[in-house]
Amino acid sequence: MIQTKRLQYFLLLILFTLFFLPFCQTAPNSSSGLPQLHLMPWPSKISLEPGKLRMDSGFHVTFKGHQEPRLLRAVDRFNHSLSNQTGIPLTSGTEADVQMTPLEVHCKDPGKATQSVRENESYTLRVSSSRAVLKAPTPVGVLHGLETLLQLLHLDTEGFFMPAVRIQDEPRFPWRGLLIDVCRHWMPMEVIKRNLDGMASTKLNVLHWHLSEDQGFRVECKSFPKLHEMGSDGNYYTKEQIREIIEYARDRGIRVVPEFDIPGHTTAWFVGYPELASAPGPYKIERQWGIHDPCMDPTREEVYTFLDTFVGEMAQLFPDEYFHIGGDEVNGKHWDANPDIMAFKKEKDMKDNHDLQAYFNERIQDILQKHGKKMIGWDEIFHPDLPKDVVVQSWRGPESLAKTAREGYMGILSNGYYLDHVLPAAYHYQVEPLSGDAADLSDKEKTRILGGEACMWAEYITPETIDSRIWPRAAAVAERLWSSQSVTGIGDMYRRLEVFDLKLDWLDLTHRSNYPLMLQRFVGEHSVEPLKTLADIVEPIKYLTRGSIRQYTQMTPMNRLVDAARPESHAARKFQNMVDEFLADAPDHNANKERIREWLMRWRNNHEELKSVLEESLLLQEIVPLSEHVAALAEAGLQAMEYIEKKQEAPLSWTDGVLPLLSPPQKPQYELIIVILPAIRTLIETARNPLVSEDFEDGEAQEWEPNIPENWRVGEEGGTLCYRLTVPGTQGKVRAPTSWSLLQDFDVSCLIFTGRARCESPIDNPHRDMVIVFHYQDPTHFYYVHFSASSDELHNIIGLVDGKDRVKISLESPEGSDARLTDMKFHDFKVTYNAETGDIKAYFDDMKTPILTATDKTFGHGQVGVGSFDDTGSFDDIKLWGKIHK
């Protein structure tokens, strides 16, 4: 799991890129006088030419070469969509009058009856002022070309038109998929169909249909009817509906790959057939999320007889050459608890459960081969004894993908493409299948990487919200898998994505239309605008953090603001751009000044407008603190702008007062994050620049001076770089912290020192600690804050070292000092010192309320640093504000 700090760093990098690098590695675009194109994914080769092909009721399609019903239906859809978007009635069919403006479609061959992985998807497109010509070797290429034509539609003062253009296009990867989980929350037919339409518009070509899980079995099975009768709550697809979806997908150039997850994630199978399980029943449908113990018994022949019959029936239903067996997250607890299974492992000389699962997979591979299918599964299925036509789907990352390719196996990447993590489109866009270890593969090995899949797992979605969690961000994944590896410009991607987002409405996707309806649900008869003002600048908390904040089950209502909020805020991204331009316009700072002030005033005043509605709505009461926080942030932003415009440095006391606003709770009950916060942080830190701002991502620590240099280094921790104390120190003559590293060029009086700290000592050590050293004079004269796992007279204190053993100067009793360093996580800290009053305050996690306080004027100034008494640990995201001592 990627750490929060890494995500924060990446988000800031995205925001920097959006403003400072808008034209770096972008898709090439039009010259002056010609329209900007918004194609997504961007074609392999494209050139704009003078001229425009006007759209009117005479626009018509003619065929040359191969024709088939699938192409005729595609043309009907094309005409229908074009007519909807322009309001111009267009005639269906392909019979044309010579006076009509033609779209000539040249299809060379019929293609395969069942679309294959390596089927030719290329096409060429030539649009001139008199006609358009689309050529493709197969119907699939024609389908892609028609989608490109629809994206070329523009409007000017004379009406609708398509710009004159030459396009030669083909995908970089042949496998470009979207996984839809219909088990954890049921998804009706109409959800699947409209998302297939969205997939077609972005040239995604594989629907990975996750059809069985602990929480549900979703396909009618004639051979074993208790699978769907007892394992689905009545929510399953009939065979006829499955065939309808497969045909619907084929009409759009999309393969359908079913996934029936085995041997784990199989609780729903066992409700009707407990004899398949490794532990005795009875079983019931699982309502909780997570990794569960039930799994199939891989030692019993009856299990394979059952699966042989099952696979045979499903192989007849699903025509694709691949059959996904899942194979992930088998914890093996029920295997270890079964004496017969343990005896089987011993008899077969199996070292562990991985060997046992490999045996199971080999047996399943034989069954699949018998029924004409090739195996695909998650990382866990990989074993050197498997046939080379097996495809491994990697959720672990490029390293795992590269290893698979080196061993001669084909693979697809999903790590980094999990849409249910509600990360920005730019995050997914920068996940490159041929990066990391995969970049070092030979050309032959690289061909084994077939592509990737975006994943939409269904723990926290419903039919009402699924579209908003897939679109438009899935288009960023689609472009990464289709377009040239050199097309990487984030700013240009967002420019095109915003237009593409609007066009998705024509496909009846609900990602935009359901948003105002869900907000209206919260406010009843009241105006929705104040709530929308707030909702537009928040996003759901990232990754799967929701499950660590409250208990969710399959029956939990998904009717809170976190469910309505969009995964990515357009308003926040636009606001960040405006702030960046404002700050770059030095020294006058006139750019966007009035617009920024207007937006900040609206957010500041919004809470008063919304307050009465929040108090009256049960569904909104939890977000009162969120609304208050936004108002306070906006006020701080306005104050920061005033300091910046007047060219005045903000007082240190003001900075101390607003900094808590920049540290929202890490796991808020409302499960939302305020995404205008980074832009307002920029304003605040410009109003009073920190003396030091260090995240160690450059791999350097040149500003730091350790007392024992060999004990300190910059290293990776949880996927991010930080400053690590790797060896504990030894006590000297004076009892005091033994290891520290100081900011060497800063001698300050008043100070604010913030960052994150992580102790690496075992959790059962009651004296585990990290310290903040300040007003350091020499090794036996300084203050320190001791953050510890326990509280007593000398632990979890503010201490003074004045030429002798340290003494406690903090006012809190041992019972009242609130020791919190009790886990292996990073924790926020803040230490402040007021040189005029001698007041010292130490904060831990909660930046509003200090856990330790003291008053002392022994040392009025000195250096600042981090360290420990006798532990190891890590520090990150260090910032220092202060007054330089004269």
Language model features: what each stretch is:
Residues 731-802:
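Secretory/extracellular carbohydrate-interaction modules
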Residues 112-322, 338, 363, 367, ...:
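Feature activates predominantly on carbohydrate-active enzymes
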Residues 25-173, 484, 488-490, 498-503, ...:
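Contiguous, structured surface segment used for ligand recognition
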Residues 803-828:
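Short, aromatic/His-centered strand-loop micro-motif at the edge of beta-sheets
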Residues 207-209, 242-249, 696, 753-755, ...:
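Short tryptophan-centered beta-strand motifs in secreted/extracellular beta-sheet-rich domains
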Residues 713-739:
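Short carbohydrate-recognition loop motifs
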Residues 39-42, 46-49, 57, 125, ...:
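Substrate-binding groove of N-acetylhexosamine-processing glycoside hydrolases
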Residues 851-877:
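Flexible glycan-contacting loops in extracellular carbohydrate-active proteins
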